């Protein structure tokens, strides 16, 4: 089973598999965020973090490769009265635009292999404006065993 099939299968359930509240670590960064600007939510899944960033006043691009997750992300944004652009692409191969975002966020980076992380983080760094903020949270790959 491919990674796409695995994630699409997980996200194709009616429930939000990670819930609808933002990641705790991300929410704890609220006072550090700019009051306006553009944010990129990488591997945003069902949109809980992208929606929260939009609620903070940021213009959000939510990036994920699962169509089922993106349908739920759009529903969650609508339910919360915010808008965000939803882009379907593999986060490891997306053509990250240069210096386009004030904030770049990736939560749960452990789902990418070390080689994939290098590709993704290179793109994320490219997409970050000078002086911008990058927020990354993850665990070791061993965490996936639990």
Regions inferred by a protein language model and the residue ranges of each:
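A short, conserved alpha-helix within the catalytic core of class I
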Residues: 111-124
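A short acidic, Gly/Pro-enriched loop at the edge of an enzyme's catalytic core
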Residues: 92-103
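Conserved SAM-binding motif I beta-strand of class I
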Residues: 59-64
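Conserved SAM/SAH-binding beta-strand->alpha-helix loop
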Residues: 66-68
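Conserved beta-strand signature within the Rossmann-like core of class I S-adenosyl-L-methionine
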Residues: 131-139
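Conserved SAM-binding strand-loop segment of SAM-dependent methyltransferases
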Residues: 80-92
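Conserved class I S-adenosyl-L-methionine
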Residues: 1-34, 36-45, 142
């Amino acid at each position: 089973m491919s990674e796409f099939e695995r994630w699409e299968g997980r996200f194709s359930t009616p429930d939000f598999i990670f819930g609808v509240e933002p990641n705790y670590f991300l929410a704890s960064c609220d006072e550090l965020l700019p009051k306006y600007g553009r944010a990129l939510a990488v591997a945003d899944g069902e949109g809980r973090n992208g929606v929260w960033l939009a609620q903070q006043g940021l213009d959000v691009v939510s990036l994920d490769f699962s169509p089922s997750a993106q349908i739920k992300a759009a529903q969650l944004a609508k339910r919360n009265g915010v808008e965000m652009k939803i882009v379907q692409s593999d986060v490891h191969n997306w053509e990250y635009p240069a210096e386009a975002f004030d904030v770049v966020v990736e939560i749960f980076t452990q789902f990418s292999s070390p080689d994939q992380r290098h590709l993704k983080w290179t793109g994320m760094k490219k997409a970050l404006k000078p002086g911008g903020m990058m927020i990354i949270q993850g665990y070791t790959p061993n965490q996936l065993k639990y």
